């Protein structure tokens, strides 16, 4: 017997107050999810216009949205879904957080309920970077599914990209010093497609970090909303959350740690618009909405952290688009998770996730502008020529691909190169011998490095050498250098003559004054141990100036939800150019010239005192360590100790008055319900320190970096949610902060965070308050390593506080007035 729930009665008369939407739009909360129904993260619409929603850690619920929504718990053996799709009379489910096998499941209707779920494709990957959402293709022939970078790529029946992905790092990468993803390698996050019957699986694109959702626009092109690694903030390899057009065979350049590829590299495809920090969740097309034309054609991206829904307006531009971002919904306490367009033309959204309070919202247009359905689709498929060339590689088709290698449009160059990579090199590589066009030479050389043998290396390097460096554009120079990088990465270190030719071409150019060209010149010249590169780079560091705001700053500055640390960092960014030069110079072996080590480590110490994301300081420390490894013994002795010692987070803690008690979630929620306005936030700040919160968590730029930054906590969580997280920290443990239980052959075990692997050993951080305290475990002594469901955070940290002190702490955390 299914359970039915009537629409909740709201305690507050206008739950939409304080939420901003464009003129003539209206947002209303239509259902507040009771605690017993969990926290909803995915939504789809069935063929009767009803909604099916999933609890992140529980089952499925069906909602009939009306004046009083009816909610029914479905009798189906499914739980832990991150993705739902109703298509052609079948429910497809992407399982992520359950005891069930991770992967895509198919559930067919049986009356008004469902039959036994059938596993379509099993994945190895769970959690917030596991398998996510699905979307059907406009022609109904395929279903696309997106998976985060903690989801191993399973075997496929076909591959849109050539199976040639590698890490492609010219210089040794720095893995994340906090141990987030040291063993997650290419292809990273990926998107696949399959037939509605569950067969014919194809890898479609890869190189993402954690694209949670995807959608087709009104012209039938695919887009995804990829995540950032917020701990990288302040480094040159930080990549903001971004909207990407997903091309068949696309590579998007995510690699772990410092290894993320610059967006300028032609061997990956860039983004359409960068948003800055955030937590991407849902993406939905406006198709079918009773909105004005511009909003029907828009894509909508949902940001969980900063309570924002953006409308992305796409203007066709050549073979791609120009994207404009508009804030469509903003507010506080709105952790958006997913959205869908209903049969009534309204947009329905979910808020929730991580066991927070959850709700369903409805957005309608109330103005007088026309809401007539717009024409969708396009007259011709711009990818048709590329597809036919791969299917039927006639000489004429290969001629066409070769011509497009020289296109002024990046999309055409990318698609032409990836198409050629799927064909035998012998069918196109000889054309390089007489080629003079810069883009064709560069693109073909990149392609040959990725797919060919050493026989074609000489051909590619010779063609690159024929180009006139002085006549290349900035982007062409960057990719001329990248082509050389790939030849040496894939084909081995350069021979003496090869090294001499490359140095003769580029050495005197550095520095050029072009920031991105100089980054890539420095990378290759340091790899080649170019004469005098240390002195020239140190001078470039001295002249680099302060950090420059990134291109996405304007978009980020409009978001009032951003906390003080981000806003302050945008005003005073660390000099990413200098940090990149440090990254390169660490590879240059000693001895260096007189005074050069002093200048270098002086810069490293200055960088160490700067601000950045949670991993920023650890990256600087690791660069120092690796630079010392390439120094002479005498230099190591002199510079092994940094000028700035880390502060002790446990020192000088403020006193607590007490008396405390064993607080429960209900007691804390009731305390907060009595009101937090007018509280002593300065004392709340002191209680944040006294309760050891600041030892692990930052708030407004102050505190530790072991746990998540809590600055925007009040914008996402209610006091009850905050109380639950403090008192029951193991209820939800994010992938980013989870510890592992490591069992040795002798039966002993170790609890800690795996930071990295090196020299046959696993480096494990064992102190949650200090990631520098580590234990080395030989890899061959480990029998198992399993993610623990136990949080490293203790569960009674507020029990020393009296009611007034606890209210001050809650007011501080929530930003109560």
Predicted regions and their residues:
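C-terminal capping alpha-helices of c-type cytochrome domains
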Residues: 30, 347, 659, 667-671, ...
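Beta-propeller domains with acidic blade repeats across secreted/periplasmic ectodomains
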Residues: 10-388, 649-651, 700-702, 778-780, ...
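C-terminal structured "cap/appendage" subdomains that terminate the fold
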Residues: 336-340, 344, 353, 554, ...
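Short boundary/loop segments of OB/S1/cold-shock single-stranded nucleic-acid-binding domains
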Residues: 728-745
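Bacterial N-terminal signal peptides
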Residues: 1-8
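Periplasmic/extracellular electron-transfer cofactor-ligation site
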Residues: 686-709, 732-735, 748-750, 756-773, ...
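C-terminal substrate/ligand-recognition segments
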Residues: 305, 340-345, 353, 409-411, ...
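Long, ordered, helix-rich scaffold segments
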Residues: 352, 365-687, 706, 713-715, ...
């Amino acid at each position: 017997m299914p359970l039915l729930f009537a629409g909740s009665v709201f305690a507050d008369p206008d739950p939409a107050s304080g939420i901003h939407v464009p003129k003539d739009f209206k947002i209303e909360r239509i259902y507040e999810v009771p605690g017993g129904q969990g926290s909803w993260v995915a939504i789809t619409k069935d063929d009767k216009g009803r909604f099916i929603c999933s609890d992140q850690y529980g089952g499925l619920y069906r909602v009939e949205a009306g004046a009083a929504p009816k909610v029914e718990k479905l009798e189906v053996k499914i739980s832990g879904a991150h993705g739902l799709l109703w298509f052609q009379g079948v429910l497809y489910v992407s399982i992520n957080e359950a005891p069930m096998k991770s992967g895509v499941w198919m559930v067919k209707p049986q009356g008004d309920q469902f039959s036994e779920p059938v596993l379509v494709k099993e994945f190895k990957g769970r959690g917030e970077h596991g398998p996510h959402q699905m979307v059907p293709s406009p022609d109904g022939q395929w279903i696309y599914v997106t998976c985060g970078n903690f989801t191993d790529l399973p075997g496929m029946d076909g591959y849109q990209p050539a199976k040639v992905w590698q890490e492609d790092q010219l210089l040794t990468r720095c893995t994340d010093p906090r141990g987030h993803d040291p063993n997650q390698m290419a292809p990273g996050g990926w998107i696949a497609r399959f037939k509605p019957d569950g067969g014919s699986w194809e890898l479609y694109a890869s190189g993402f970090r954690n694209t949670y959702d995807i959608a087709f626009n009104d012209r039938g092109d695919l887009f995804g909303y990829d995540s950032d690694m917020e701990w990288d903030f302040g480094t040159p390899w930080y990549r903001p959350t971004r909207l990407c057009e997903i091309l068949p065979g696309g590579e998007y350049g995510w690699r772990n740690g410092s290894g993320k590829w610059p967006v300028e590299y032609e061997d990956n495809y860039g983004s359409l618009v960068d948003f800055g920090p955030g937590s991407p969740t849902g993406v939905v097309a406006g198709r079918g909405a009773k909105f004005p034309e511009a909003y029907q054609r828009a894509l909508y991206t949902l940001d969980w952290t900063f309570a924002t829904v953006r409308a992305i307006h796409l203007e066709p531009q050549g073979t791609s688009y120009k994207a404009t971002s508009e804030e469509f919904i903003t507010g506080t306490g709105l952790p958006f998770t997913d959205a869908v367009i209903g049969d009534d033309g309204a947009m329905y959204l979910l808020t929730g996730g991580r066991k927070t309070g959850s709700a369903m919202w409805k957005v309608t247009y109330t103005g007088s502008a026309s809401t007539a359905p717009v024409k969708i689709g396009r007259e011709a498929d711009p990818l048709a020529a590329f597809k036919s060339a791969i299917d039927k590689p006639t000489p004429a088709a290969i001629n066409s691909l070769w011509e497009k290698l020289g296109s002024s449009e990046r999309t055409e160059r990318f698609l032409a190169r990836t198409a050629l990579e799927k064909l035998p090199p012998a069918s196109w590589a000889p054309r390089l011998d007489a080629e003079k066009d810069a883009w064709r030479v560069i693109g073909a050389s990149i392609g040959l490095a990725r797919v060919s043998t050493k026989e074609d290396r000489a051909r590619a390097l010779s063609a690159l050498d024929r180009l006139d460096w002085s006549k290349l554009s900035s982007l062409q120079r960057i990719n001329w250098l990248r082509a050389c990088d790939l030849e040496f990465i894939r084909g081995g270190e350069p021979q003496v003559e090869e090294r001499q030719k490359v140095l003769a071409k580029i050495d005197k150019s550095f520095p050029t004054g072009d920031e991105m060209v100089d980054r890539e010149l420095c990378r290759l010249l340091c790899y080649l141990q170019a004469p005098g590169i240390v002195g020239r780079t140190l001078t470039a560091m001295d002249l680099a100036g302060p950090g420059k705001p990134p291109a996405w700053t304007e978009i980020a500055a409009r978001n009032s939800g951003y906390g003080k640390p981000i806003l302050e960092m945008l005003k005073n960014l660390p000099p990413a150019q200098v940090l990149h030069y440090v990254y390169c110079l660490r590879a240059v072996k000693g001895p260096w010239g007189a005074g050069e080590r002093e200048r270098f480590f002086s810069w490293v110490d200055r960088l160490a005192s700067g601000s950045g994301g949670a991993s920023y300081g650890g990256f600087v420390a690791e660069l120092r360590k690796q630079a010392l490894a390439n120094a002479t013994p005498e230099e190591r002795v002199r510079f092994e100790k940094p000028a700035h010692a880390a502060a002790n987070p446990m020192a000088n803690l403020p006193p607590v008055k007490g008396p405390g008690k064993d607080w429960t979630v209900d007691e804390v929620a009731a305390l907060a319900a009595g009101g937090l306005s007018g509280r002593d936030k300065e004392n709340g700040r002191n209680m944040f320190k006294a309760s050891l919160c600041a030892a692990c968590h930052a708030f407004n730029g102050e505190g530790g970096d072991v746990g998540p930054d809590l600055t925007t906590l009040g914008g996402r969580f209610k006091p009850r949610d905050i109380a639950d997280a403090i008192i029951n920290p193991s209820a939800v443990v994010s992938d980013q902060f989870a510890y592992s239980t490591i069992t040795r052959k002798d039966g002993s075990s170790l609890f800690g965070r795996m930071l990295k692997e090196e020299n046959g050993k696993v480096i494990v951080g064992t102190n949650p308050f200090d990631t520098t305290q580590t234990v080395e475990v030989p890899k061959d002594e480990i029998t198992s390593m399993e993610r623990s469901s136990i949080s490293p955070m203790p569960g009674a940290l507020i029990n020393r506080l009296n009611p007034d002190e606890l209210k001050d702490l809650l007011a501080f955390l929530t930003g109560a007035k």
